[in-house]
Amino acid sequence: MIEKAISRRIKEFRQLGEKGEVEFDFRPFLDFSVKATIRTELAFCISTANSSATAGLKFQRLLGQGVGVKEALTLAGVRFHNRKAEYIREAFKSFKLVEKALEAESSKAREILLKIKGLGMKEASHFLRNVGREDVAIIDRHILRWLERQGYEVPGTMTAKKYLEVEKILMEISEERGESLAEMDLRIWAEMTGKVLK
């Protein structure tokens, strides 16, 4: 079940990046699907910072149904909804930067995305992974806990420099395992949470 869900999710990520839209199916982990565009995926990645993936998915679904950004964030139970609404509106205004990033290779794309208010290393990497990039790591608390369990020392504070150092470790592990960072991230997340989301 987990392997099949990971494979399906990777295909959905690629489709979103190639065609600009996709319907993510989260069954059997959550009993709903979410239609996504590049724009709503960017909003989703901003919404999930310091909030739950499930709240972010509910937000994205509401956004796709035509509910306004701030109202959708509030209804979905996303933490810090006022600040995130501002970040998402600014990101939508800066969408030319997103388009430019999507034309660049992953490390350059992430640098470009970091110019958008509300996107840090994790959020920019999350967005890139979710549009089909398989060579960036989303370093969240689940990944850090997993690394600690594997005997790695993890930083207490995540600067951009430390993010890249941890990403390099994850890249080495993924190469040893014969899988992409995107696949490994989903597998670790499933191990830590019991779910394959995004």
UniProtKB/Swiss-Prot annotation:
InterPro entries the UniProt entry points to: DNA_glyclase/AP_lyase_Ogg, DNA_glycosylase, HhH-GPD_domain, HhH_base_excis_C
Record's catalysed reaction(s): 2'-deoxyribonucleotide-(2'-deoxyribose 5'-phosphate)-2'-deoxyribonucleotide-DNA = a 3'-end 2'-deoxyribonucleotide-(2,3-dehydro-2,3-deoxyribose 5'-phosphate)-DNA + a 5'-end 5'-phospho-2'-deoxyribonucleoside-DNA + H(+)
Catalytic residues (positions): 122, 140
Ranges that cross the membrane: none
A Pfam family it matches: Ogg-HhH
EC number(s) on file: 3.2.2.-, 4.2.99.18
Family annotation (SUPFAM superfamilies): DNA-glycosylase
GO MF terms, alphabetically ordered: class I DNA-(apurinic or apyrimidinic site) endonuclease activity; hydrolase activity, hydrolyzing N-glycosyl compounds
Domain of life from the UniProt record: Archaea
UniProt site positions, description: Important for guanine/8-oxoguanine distinction: 198
UniProt pH dependence: Optimum pH is 8.5.
GO BP terms in the entry: base-excision repair
Assigned protein family: Belongs to the type-2 OGG1 family.
Protein role: Catalyzes the excision of an oxidatively damaged form of guanine (7,8-dihydro-8-oxoguanine = 8-oxoG) from DNA. Also cleaves the DNA backbone at apurinic/apyrimidinic sites (AP sites). Efficiently cleaves oligomers containing 8-oxoG:C and 8-oxoG:G base pairs, and is less effective on oligomers containing 8-oxoG:T and 8-oxoG:A mispairs.
The protein, known as: 8-oxoguanine DNA glycosylase/AP lyase
Organism field: Archaeoglobus fulgidus (strain ATCC 49558 / DSM 4304 / JCM 9628 / NBRC 100126 / VC-16)
Gene that produces this protein: ogg
